[in-house]
Amino acid sequence: MPRDRLKELQEKATVNTIHAYNYDPPARKYDVESQPLINQDADFEMFLERCSNIRGGLKSLEEDYDAVVQLHGALLSTPGADSENSNKLKSHNQMFFSKAEQIKNSLKILSEETSRIPTTACGIMRAKSDQVKSIYKTFENIMLNFNREQDEYKEKAKRKIVDYLKIRNMQLSDEEIENAVSSGNLSEVTKGVMLALNEKKALYDEVKSRADELKNLERQMGELAQMFHDLHIMVVSQAKMVDSIVNSVENATEYAKQARGNVEEARNLQKRARKMKVCIIIGSIIAVLILILFIQSAVCHFTPIC
């Protein structure tokens, strides 16, 4: 009985179709180890964004500094105790120190991250270092201006206290006023000012208000001194890192010059080798020709062929 070839071909076609639908292509091999853990471009963009945020904080810090300067002028020009402006001054000073501390910590983190960049990425390292250095400079200028303003206000407030005390014919030296303010015993020194009359009481209140402001200034000056100390340490660390970058760039330049010299020397050696090879070939050809001539002359001499 002949086989049904048509039915057999249909069955094979059905099997091939099923295999085609069930075919699972092999997964593409992906070498994870060869891929970088950090995208350098994305990392640098994030770094610039953080620098931009810190610059925004510096702008806010400068606004607080301007407000402190205006309040100092208002307090020095206002007769009598001004509790409202004194409270505003205290609030702005607290905000200034709080923001300055945050900026200092952020700069410290950026500086540490920059120092951990491998020396092979000199371009990125230098760009980040320049950004941090610029922010450091701006921050340092704001802090120096604030410190200078605090010193000037302290001296003006002390002179105003002396002027008030002179009204009651109380002569105190700068050292006595300094000790009274720092110890909080100004009331003992100026107790002669406190009389029954309302005018004298107001005068005493103003002197005491100025003294309280000076006490706050003394405390803030101590905080400023500590902050400047920390800032100096970070600037020194940043300078060392910049020196390291410069040394790396100089070493890379020296290596490049040395490599260029090696390449030129290799080219010269290659030229010499070619010349030597040509000379050897020419010499070999000449030697072969001489040998042929010698053999020919010898054959002609010893045989009657020639």
Swiss-Prot record:
One of its GO terms (biological process) is exocytosis. Pfam families: SNARE, Syntaxin. It comes from the Eukaryota. SMART domains: SynN, t_SNARE. The keyword Manganese does not apply. The keyword Cell membrane applies. Gene3D superfamilies: 1.20.5.110, 1.20.58.70. Residues 204-266 form the t-SNARE coiled-coil homology domain. Residues 1-279 are cytoplasmic. PROSITE patterns: SYNTAXIN, T_SNARE. GO terms for cellular component: endomembrane system; plasma membrane; presynapse; SNARE complex. Residues 301-306 are extracellular. The chain crosses the membrane at residues 280-300. Its main location: membrane. GO terms for molecular function: SNAP receptor activity; SNARE binding. Keywords: Cell membrane, Coiled coil, Membrane, Neurotransmitter transport, Transmembrane, Transmembrane helix, Transport. Belongs to the syntaxin family. Potentially involved in docking of synaptic vesicles at presynaptic active zones. Acts in the intestine to regulate anterior body muscle contractions (aBOC) and the expulsion steps during the defecation motor program (DMP). PANTHER family: SYNTAXIN, SYNTAXIN-3-RELATED. This is Putative syntaxin-3.
